[in-house]
Amino acid sequence: ISINQDLKAITDMLLTEQIQARRRCLAALRQRLLDLDSDVSLFNGDLLPNGRCS
């Protein structure tokens, strides 16, 4: 049972790290788009202020 709990904890940590890395990547891409053309509003009504999709 302990091994299964350890594996689950490791999997959860890896998934959390992967999600955080993807969010950082998306934030960087969003900023690059804003920097490329600051005259165009990239606001999308489906996005919440924290960058998550509704």
Curated annotation (Swiss-Prot):
Pfam families: ELH. Its main location: secreted. Keywords: Amidation, Disulfide bond, Hormone, Neuropeptide, Secreted. Disulfide bonds join C25-C53. One of its GO terms (cellular component) is extracellular region. GO terms for biological process: neuropeptide signaling pathway. It is found in: Secreted. One of its GO terms (molecular function) is hormone activity. The modification Leucine amide is found at L36. It comes from the Eukaryota. Injected in sexually mature animals califin C excites LB and LC cells of the abdominal ganglion and cause egg-laying. Belongs to the molluscan ELH family. This protein consists of a large 36-residue subunit, bound by a single disulfide-bond to a small 18-residue subunit. This is Califin-C. It comes from Aplysia californica. The lineage of its organism: Eukaryota, Metazoa, Spiralia, Lophotrochozoa, Mollusca.
